[in-house]
């Protein structure tokens, strides 16, 4: 919950409720790209207003930059109308944060599926919260709890929630790999060439973290859309005949 993706998503919600939060604006102003330059931001910081308001009245503000700012303002209004879970989905799918992650992954040669996995986890965390402020507090509390748990010594019993990247070098008695469906692993944007190979390597990392037991599962639906089992399951020699359904539950 201290990951920069979590902080980005929280910043959108916090800014929607607190337009004077300069720190939140600076964090997301170009995520996705809005072409608000460092020079323009420096100019706005010299004005006696909040940063967002100041940007609108900067003498050097170009028309196309103003249009991006107006679009951001409208997005913030839409975010403010929604509860955190729906607001984060809006940020990711409508504002374009997931597309920003896709561009970032290409630029940094990073795993897009890992970043989407983190964004999905943060989005799920928002369920049950009523405001951006409550969501931010919930993340802060979860982060505090995880740090406290990591400090505890001598307790060998527990559950570790981690990403494929975070699991490298670790070993567990039992490993659960959920959501092994096309569009999740591999992620829909990373299905070709080196990106696909990177996702396959990460999947192998997950498989090999176990000493005794390995549990693989997939979800039939996501955001009300049907899904198919991951191709990586098929590559292991598994096929859909091994998935049985009884009373709408997978076994």
What are these regions (language model features)?
Residues 34, 46, 93, 208-209:
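Solvent-exposed polar/charged
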Residues 190-194:
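Short glycine-enriched, charge-decorated loop/helix-capping segments at active-site entrances
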Residues 20, 114-117, 172, 198-200, ...:
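A generic structural signal for residues located within well-ordered alpha-helices
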Residues 60-166, 187, 244-246, 250:
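Accessory C-terminal helicase-associated subdomains
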Residues 134-187, 198, 202-222:
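Conserved helicase core region in the C-terminal RecA-like lobe
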């Amino acid at each position: 919950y201290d990951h920069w993706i979590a902080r980005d998503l929280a910043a959108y919600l916090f800014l929607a409720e607190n337009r004077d939060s300069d720190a939140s604006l600076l964090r997301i102003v170009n995520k996705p790209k809005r072409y608000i330059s460092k020079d323009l931001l420096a100019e706005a910081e010299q004005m006696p207003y909040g940063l967002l308001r100041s940007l609108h009245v900067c003498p050097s503000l170009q028309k196309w930059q103003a249009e991006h700012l107006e679009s951001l303002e409208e997005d913030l209004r839409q975010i403010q109308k929604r509860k955190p879970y729906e607001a984060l989905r809006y940020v990711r799918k409508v504002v374009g944060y997931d597309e920003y992650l896709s561009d970032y992954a290409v630029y940094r040669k990073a795993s897009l599926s890992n970043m989407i996995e983190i964004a999905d986890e943060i989005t799920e965390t928002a369920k049950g919260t009523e405001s951006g402020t409550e969501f931010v507090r919930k993340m802060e509390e979860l982060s505090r709890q995880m740090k406290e748990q990591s400090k505890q010594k001598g307790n060998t019993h527990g559950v570790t929630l981690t990403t494929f990247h975070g699991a490298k070098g670790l070993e567990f008695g039992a490993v659960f790999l959920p959501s092994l469906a096309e569009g999740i692993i591999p992620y829909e944007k990373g299905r070709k060439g080196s990106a696909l190979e990177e996702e396959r390597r990460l999947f192998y990392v997950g498989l090999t973290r176990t000493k005794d037991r390995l549990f693989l599962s997939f979800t039939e639906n996501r955001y009300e859309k049907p899904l198919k089992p991951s191709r990586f399951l098929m590559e292991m020699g598994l096929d859909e005949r091994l998935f049985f359904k009884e009373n709408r539950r997978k076994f």
